[in-house]
């Protein structure tokens, strides 16, 4: 990407490091970034909207600092007369320092700069900054914006000061903090990363495979696939051009795109749109949906008014197993994802409320069809209250287009409901819990009180329910006493209660509160 010579002269001074700038490790960076939220605390900006302002500012500062760094290197190598080439164009007047030096109407200057950068980099950045209303002075007065700009200006976010993995992790840290701050709203955009890791590790994407998340939120599933390959010693660059996501919320889709870019992933497709009503990724050669090696999602639980009227004559053939009711889109998501799996090695992982395992009616019929077609490979029941915004217990379903011979006409059913760490307002699936669940799935064998391989014939006898307690009995607690001891303890407690009642009655009578 090329810049005009005029751009260099207006922005070159910003390459010099300021005396007060911080050289970051990850903890320093994360702490400084979260302090930006404290600047907004008590302002007219609702905490549910903090991410709409802070995350774009972080991304804006990062690309400007990298631009400055690249420019300084070229000047040092070639002098002032050279054709400048950058990853992203920063048009004249749209640099961070231009906005920082604006004396008034700062929001207007900022919004104009962000839109100019998007327009100059349409292939990669168009719409990436979202739709935050920077010009609303009632919410964002000049003084507040200047405080935010100065706070971020203390950071040098060029590559020589902070690597892409560190700034990417810091961005993920901010997303997690915003999720914690908003809780109920967070379920719309954030999946706990231990759950992401478990799902990705089960699917085990390989270098060069295509990955698709039809409800991609902030991009955690796609990043998880890249990290999985990196951890296995593969080259994550083989995923360039092979990561796909669709997200209905504009701000969340923008956050996902910034997230991938800050992690150094340059070539991907995150599209905004309603997946169930208007899927973006299609295949003109077949006239159907595009298909992918790995399909992975945590869609909204039991979504109402999800688009049933479209599916009554769905042009993409997604209602192949049945048409779900308008009150719950759970099996609409499942059928969309099944339709999006590639032939051969296509596989998928989806998070659903556990009610999807046993609800009857049309959902029971769809579940029966999926089982009879031998698509469901594994069911994992999770602990309650792991996800933001709901205390419901969830499950993970693993489906595969073509099971290996050893798994045909069988389903591995896992009860992981006891694996969690209890928190004050939410439970947590820690890495050690996810690792244990993964081992059960990979070993694919019975584990006492935890996992069981169930034949389809047995599931048919249970009327096609996948209710986990029908197949895996919860472990009997070791602290349950023998029957005789329990009866004796009960009698003692009963006698103690009667004696306490008599003492209370005597005291109240003596005090005149009760008549004799």
Predicted regions and their residues:
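Non-catalytic, mostly N-terminal accessory regions of nucleic-acid modification and defense proteins
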Residues: 1-207, 269-280, 381-385, 407-417, ...
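Alpha-helix initiation/capping motif
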Residues: 22, 138-141, 159-163, 188, ...
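Helical mechanochemical/support elements of P-loop NTPase systems and associated helical scaffolds
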Residues: 29, 46-49, 144, 166, ...
């Amino acid at each position: 990407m090329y810049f005009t010579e005029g751009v260099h002269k207006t922005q070159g001074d910003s390459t010099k490091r300021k005396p007060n700038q911080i050289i970051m490790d990850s903890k320093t960076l994360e702490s400084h970034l979260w302090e930006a939220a404290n600047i907004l605390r008590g302002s007219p900006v609702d905490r549910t909207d903090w991410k709409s302002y802070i995350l774009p500012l972080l991304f804006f500062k990062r690309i400007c600092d990298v631009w400055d760094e690249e420019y300084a290197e070229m000047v040092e190598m070639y002098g002032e007369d050279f054709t400048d080439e950058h990853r992203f164009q920063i048009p004249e007047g749209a640099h961070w320092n231009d906005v920082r030096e604006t004396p008034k109407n700062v929001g207007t200057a900022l919004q104009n700069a962000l839109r100019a950068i998007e327009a100059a980099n349409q292939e990669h950045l168009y719409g990436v900054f979202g739709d935050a209303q920077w010009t609303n002075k009632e919410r964002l007065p000049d003084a507040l914006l200047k405080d935010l700009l100065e706070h971020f200006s203390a950071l040098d976010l060029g590559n020589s000061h902070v690597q892409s993995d560190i700034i990417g992790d810091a961005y993920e840290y901010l997303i997690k903090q915003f999720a914690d701050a908003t809780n109920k709203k967070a379920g719309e955009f954030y999946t706990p990363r231990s759950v992401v890791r478990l799902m990705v590790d089960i699917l085990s994407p390989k270098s060069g495979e295509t990955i698709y998340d039809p409800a991609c939120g902030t991009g955690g599933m796609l990043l998880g696939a890249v990290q999985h390959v990196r951890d296995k010693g593969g080259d994550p660059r083989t995923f360039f051009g092979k990561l796909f996501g669709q997200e209905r919320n504009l701000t969340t889709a923008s956050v996902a795109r910034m997230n991938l870019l800050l992690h150094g992933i340059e070539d991907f497709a995150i599209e905004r749109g309603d997946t169930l009503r208007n899927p973006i990724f299609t295949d003109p050669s077949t006239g159907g949906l595009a298909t992918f090696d790995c399909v992975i999602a945590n869609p909204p639980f039991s979504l109402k008014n999800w688009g049933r009227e479209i599916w009554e004559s769905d042009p993409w053939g997604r209602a192949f197993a049945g048409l779900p009711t308008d009150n719950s889109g759970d099996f609409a998501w499942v059928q969309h994802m099944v339709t999006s799996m590639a032939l051969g090695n296509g596989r998928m992982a989806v998070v659903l409320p556990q009610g999807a395992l046993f609800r009857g009616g049309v959902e029971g019929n769809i579940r029966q069809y999926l089982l009879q077609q031998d698509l469901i490979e594994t069911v994992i029941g999770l602990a309650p209250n792991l996800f933001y915004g709901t205390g419901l217990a969830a499950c993970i379903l693993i489906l595969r287009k073509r099971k290996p011979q050893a798994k045909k006409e069988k389903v591995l059913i896992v009860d992981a409901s006891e694996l969690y760490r209890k928190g004050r307002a939410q439970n947590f699936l820690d890495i050690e819990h996810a690792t244990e669940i993964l081992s059960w799935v990979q070993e694919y064998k019975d584990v006492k009180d935890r996992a069981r391989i169930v034949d389809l014939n047995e599931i048919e006898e249970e009327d096609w329910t996948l209710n986990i307690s029908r197949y895996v009995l919860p472990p009997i607690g070791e602290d349950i006493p023998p029957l005789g001891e329990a009866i004796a303890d009960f009698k003692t407690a009963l006698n103690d209660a009667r004696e306490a009642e008599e003492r209370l009655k005597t005291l109240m009578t003596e005090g005149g509160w009760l008549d004799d």
